[in-house]
Amino acid sequence: MSFKYDIPCVATTRSGAEVPLSLRAGKTFRDKAIGYMGARSIEKSCGTVYARGRSLHTLFMRIPVDVCWIGRFDPSNQSWPVVSLDASVAPWRILFAPRGAVGGIEIAPGTFTEPDRPLLIRRLD
């Protein structure tokens, strides 16, 4: 299964490190329902952004994912604030957004760790 990642981003972590990311938009109900079902892996530092939606699932997935819960997109600096991180979410889970989150980003597992989680994800395009 191959995905087209067409949103270049950079995540700024607590330590100040900048991690380059390649994201794709999950805009439709179908995008959200299917997601990474059946995928055998996700490329390092790649993921899908669901800008709206206070829940995500890993049903029928074969692999774990990291979930960055994001706040509202800020058009002035082209970024999403990261509200929290759920690392290595196992398959067959249903997740609900924490307070303050309006969406989520499913990303390759191990991209971030909790002590150095991202604070901000900024679009580069």
Model-derived features: positions:
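Compact, glycine-rich, soluble single-domain proteins
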Residues: M1-D125
